[in-house]
Amino acid sequence: MIIVDQENKTILNNYIEIFINDSADCMNGILARTLDGTICTLGEYARLSRTQMVFNEIVEAYAKGISVFNMPKE
């Protein structure tokens, strides 16, 4: 489960930041920047995390305007 501070839209640890790359198609245009600075597409992140639910929750939250997430540690 992704927990987001609704007021500040941030959380204390293990962040990823989601942002849009307008030059790419929809799925590959949603990028994830992890706390260590790694950037990958959201699809790649979901595969790396091996959790489709995480991917779905990110997409839902992003649609609500939330772009910084506290990701569960494996």
How does the language model describe each region?
Residues M1-E74:
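Eukaryotic intrinsically disordered, low-complexity regulatory linkers and tails enriched in Ser/Thr/Pro
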